[in-house]
From Swiss-Prot:
Type E motif: annotated span: 619-694
Keyword Disulfide bond: no
Protein origin, superkingdom: Eukaryota
Keywords annotated in UniProt: Repeat
BP term (GO), one: RNA modification
Protein name, as recorded: Pentatricopeptide repeat-containing protein At4g04370
Entry similarity comment: Belongs to the PPR family. PCMP-E subfamily.
InterPro entries cross-referenced by the UniProt entry: E_motif (IPR046848), Pentatricopeptide_rpt (IPR002885), PPR_At4g14850-like_plant (IPR046960), TPR-like_helical_dom_sf (IPR011990)
Length: 729
């Protein structure tokens, strides 16, 4: 008897300790104490299990919870009211509907807590209809639902009609006075994009706490309504409430999205005044806001005020600089991050690799990749996608393919990255093979980015049959209407010389942007249809859209290709005079080319001297070619001297100089040009061209001697056919 009493007392002691730990939320210690209890060969009783099951639910320890349930059954405690309730809550937490329902149905007595747990289980699983059926059954059995019951039902609501029904339910049962219920409804109205209904509910609430105000402010932040946020901030002050971290965070998010720098600065002042400027999350939000507003110096100043920078603030800074196109500065910040000893996040790695891709720096990108591998960082799919893109942009497709093939999980971005890589490097065959593999091996749907990459490759290769095939895929896949795809189709057909199809695709675009107009104009101009190009430019002006640099470049290029000197000069003059568009280097080069093609060499050189603030060796090369073709030796001599002073770094320019000196019989200068080119280690790549016939692309190089017999035979055949054609006519 003494021993039994001692055991009971010991069990009571452990139960008391376990319940105390559970009430204070120390669930890990609950399980640890239970282990000690078993080690002392003490058996748990009905008072032990509820706390254990609660701990398993809180710590996400399902397997341990299942073993506890087994012990409950072995000990014959399954009919205990509190244990069965805890089991329902455990299974509800893990969404195990069948297990929870089985325990629920076996219960002899059920109160509002059991019903609420079961209702929440169905609602969180998205089965709101069954949850409502349980509410009706609960009411039929005479048990009145409580506010927590409604909160559990709201946890799975995704549709506005369901929310409106539960709102009526809340009014009927008087839960519209419960602030927790009303805050939950406010949040759901905002998530369902019914911010107006949320505002009506907010105004009707008799009581509001900080959660109510922040929910409403976050709702307006999600739709970018800064004016309503300001009104709420003023009302808060009138109610004697001060904004907290969440209030400022939501407001800063909108300021950044709307690029409202003035509002962002005002919020920054308020954050400092209220003493929240020490909050790490708000400092990160300030960095994001300033970067989105294009104020990188201000973002640097905020970053410098953070004593212990975490990986989040470093990553925000790096990715923000990348969005601004400041790749070099992003790499500097990355270097500072490494020196600080901060851990790397996958997002930071992806942003840095993207910076290397933007700079076209293979060495730097490979170094970052090597650093990541040496330090054992695990790369997620977005980071691996960035590496694929970086290596592809740097021309190392073999490395891109290795990374792609070793990926455990590939998303649509992965496939787009590798396909785009091969397409941009004009390896259309491999790009198409990967495209077919994607359709065969995955359930990924063809999207606009995949198609645009392939169409761009077709444009570069002049592969019209393949382009038509991709056009068919676009139609079958229901990708259109999409401005990116439509514009890419116009570009592909234009560059392949199929202007009728380009025009049809252009006409089918419901909303034509400046890029699509520019592509069509350039297409007609390039293929000798300058008059039609100018007609389309006139249509563009009548459409009400304002021409920009893209349009003027397309029009000037068309005039240059078609010898339309007066029209080109007139349009160039109208750029600044009529439209306020300042010409850039490309526009000026077009005018020089226009004058050179019209054999107005002196005018071209005069225009160059008057309009180019910095010397341009490429434009001088255009004039030099025209001089040699038209025998303008005086201008040619001056240009040669100018080009020598610029010390060209391209072999082609030295070759041009050598030919020009030879034409002027300046043999010493010819020798000097070739010697200078050799001393710099420059080599002139041979000229080449390629032709695509019957789906096969063949490349021809200058002085190419392979298959010479076949080439000579074909030339003889063509010569005979031309002679025969001439005699017949």
């Amino acid at each position: 008897m003494i021993r039994t009493s001692s055991v009971l007392n010991s069990t009571k002691y452990f139960n008391s300790h376990i319940n105390h730990l559970s009430s204070h939320g120390d669930h890990k210690q609950v399980l640890s104490t239970f282990s000690s209890m078993l080690a002392n060969k003490l058996l748990p009783d009905t008072f032990t299990f509820p706390s254990l099951l609660k701990a398993c639910a809180s710590l996400q320890r399902l397997s341990f919870g299942l073993s506890i349930h087994q012990q409950v059954l072995v000990n014959g405690f399954s009919s205990d009211f509190y244990i069965s309730s805890s089991l329902v809550n455990l299974y509800a937490k893990f969404g195990l509907l069948a297990h929870a329902r089985k325990v629920f149905e076996e219960m002899r007595e059920r109160d509002v807590v059991h019903w609420t747990a079961m209702i929440g289980c169905y609602s969180r699983a998205g089965i709101v209809g069954e949850a409502c059926s349980l509410v009706n059954e609960m009411r039929f059995q005479g048990i009145k639902p409580g506010p927590v019951t409604l909160l559990e039902m709201l946890s799975g609501v995704l549709e506005i009609t369901q929310l409106q029904c539960l709102h009526d339910f809340a009014v009927i049962y008087g839960f519209d006075c419960d602030i927790a219920v009303m805050n939950s409804m406010l949040n759901l109205y905002c998530k369902c994009d019914h911010v107006g209904d949320a505002k009506d509910l907010f105004d009707q609430m008799e009581q509001r706490d900080m959660v109510s105000w922040n929910t409403m402010i976050s709702g307006y932040a999600s739709v970018g309504n800064m004016s309503e946020i300001l009104k709420l901030l003023y009302r808060m002050r009138g109610d004697g409430l001060r904004p907290d971290q969440q209030t400022f965070g939501a407001s800063l998010s909108v300021s950044g999205t709307m690029c409202d720098l003035e509002m962002g600065r005002m919020l920054h002042c308020q954050i400092v005044k209220t003493g929240f400027d020490v909050d790490m999350h708000l400092k990160t939000a300030l960095i994001t806001m300033y970067l989105k507003c294009g104020k990188e110096e201000a973002s640097y100043r905020v970053l410098e005020t953070i004593p212990n920078k975490d990986v989040v603030c470093w990553t925000v800074m790096i990715s923000g600089l990348m969005r601004l196109g400041r790749a070099e500065k992003a790499l500097i910040v990355f270097s500072e991050m490494l020196q600080s000893g901060s851990d790397l996040s996958s997002e930071a790695i992806a942003s840095v690799v993207a910076s290397c891709a933007q700079l076209g720096s293979f060495d730097l990108g490979a170094s970052v990749h090597g650093y990541v591998l040496r330090h054992g960082y695990t790369l997620d799919t977005p980071a691996l996608n960035s590496l694929i893109t970086m290596y592809a942009k740097c021309g190392h497709l073999d490395k891109s393919l290795v990374i792609f093939e070793r990926m455990n999980e590939r998303d649509l971005v992965s496939w787009n990255a590798i396909i785009s890589g091969y397409a941009q490097n004009v390896d259309l065959c491999k790009a198409l093979l990967l495209f077919e593999e994607m359709k065969f091996k995955t359930v990924q749907q063809v999207d606009s980015f995949t198609v645009v990459s392939l169409l761009q490759a077709c444009s570069s290769a002049g592969a019209l049959p393949v382009g038509k095939l991709i056009h068919c895929i676009v139609i079958r896949s229901f990708i259109r209407p999409c401005s990116l795809v439509d514009t890419a189709l116009v570009d592909m057909y234009s560059k392949c010389g199929y202007l009728e199809a380009a025009q049809r695709c252009f006409d089918s675009i419901s909303w034509k942007d400046v890029v699509s107009w520019g592509i069509l104009i350039a297409g007609y101009g390039f293929h000798g249809k300058g008059d039609i190009a100018l007609e389309i430019y006139s249509e563009f002006l009548h459409s009400g859209m304002e021409p920009n640099h893209v349009i003027f470049l397309a029009v000037l290029s068309s005039c240059s290709h078609n010898g339309m000197v007066q029209q080109g000069l007139k349009i160039f003059s109208s750029m600044v005079r009529d439209f306020g568009v300042e010409p850039n280097h490309e526009h000026l080069a077009c005018v020089v080319d226009l004058l050179c093609r019209a054999k107005r060499i002196e005018d071209a050189f005069k225009f160059y001297k008057e309009n180019f603030t910095r010397p341009s060796i490429d434009v001088l090369g255009i004039i030099l070619d025209a001089c040699r073709a038209n025998g303008k030796t005086e201008v040619e001599d001056i240009i040669c001297e100018d080009m020598i002073e610029l010390k060209p770094g391209d072999a082609g320019h030295y070759v041009k100089l050598g030919h020009s000196f030879a034409a002027m019989k300046r043999w010493d200068d010819v020798s000097e040009s070739w010697n200078q080119m050799r001393s710099l280690g420059l080599k002139k790549l041979p000229g080449w061209s390629k032709i695509e016939m019957n789906g096969k692309t063949t490349t021809f190089f200058m002085n190419h001697t392979s298959h010479s017999d076949d080439t000579v035979s074909l030339l003889k055949l063509l010569s005979r056919e031309m002679m025969q054609f001439g005699s017949n006519n």
